[in-house]
């Protein structure tokens, strides 16, 4: 849903299907939740020993809530499920995933609208996205990432965002990250 300049996964914006609407594009591999489970279950003992599991990330995993719910039904509670998300989904979708997802990593870009809109090329509200997360998920299950984005923000603006997120939303686990630009 976002169009971030430095997105490391440009493929998430490419079509899955060819123009006929049925044929899958080259390089795309469609998996059911069961097929994915069968691939990653090789790490079952490791996940159980470490308290680990699987992380669904970008593109935007909240675009596929049914897939995530089905995967949880297959793997059960023995694995942790984490979402790394930009939070661009409806309140209802996030709510439907509350009991399925153990941890949320929210990549918020910036709470300053001008920075957020310029970088993501969208008109979503980062404040509204954080507000819905606060209403739904206990803070101990949330990490908020605020990246330093070259040519878009500064260390100071990120520090400001982190302080405001803590103050306005009460999230304690807010971290500054540095984007590694892949060209």
Where are these regions (language model features)?
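Canonical Radical SAM [4Fe-4S] cluster-binding loop centered on the CxxxCxxC motif
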Residues: 1-30
């Amino acid at each position: 849903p976002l169009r971030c300049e430095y997105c490391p996964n440009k493929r998430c914006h490419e079509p899955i299907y060819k123009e006929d609407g049925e044929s899958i594009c080259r390089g795309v591999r469609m998996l059911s939740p069961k097929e994915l489970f069968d691939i990653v279950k090789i790490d079952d003992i490791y996940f159980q020993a470490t308290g680990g599991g699987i992380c669904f990330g970008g593109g935007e995993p909240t675009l596929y809530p049914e897939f995530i719910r089905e995967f949880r039904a297959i793997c059960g509670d023995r694995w942790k499920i984490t979402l790394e998300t930009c939070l661009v989904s409806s309140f209802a979708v996030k709510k439907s995933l509350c009991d399925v997802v153990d941890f949320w990593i929210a990549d918020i870009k910036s709470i300053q609208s001008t920075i957020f809109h310029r970088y993501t090329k969208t008109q979503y509200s980062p404040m509204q996205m954080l507000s819905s997360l606060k209403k739904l998920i206990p803070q101990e299950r949330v990490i908020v990432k605020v990246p330093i984005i070259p040519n878009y923000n500064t260390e100071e603006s990120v520090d400001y965002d982190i302080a405001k997120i803590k103050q306005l939303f009460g999230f304690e686990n807010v971290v500054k990250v540095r984007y590694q630009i892949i060209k």
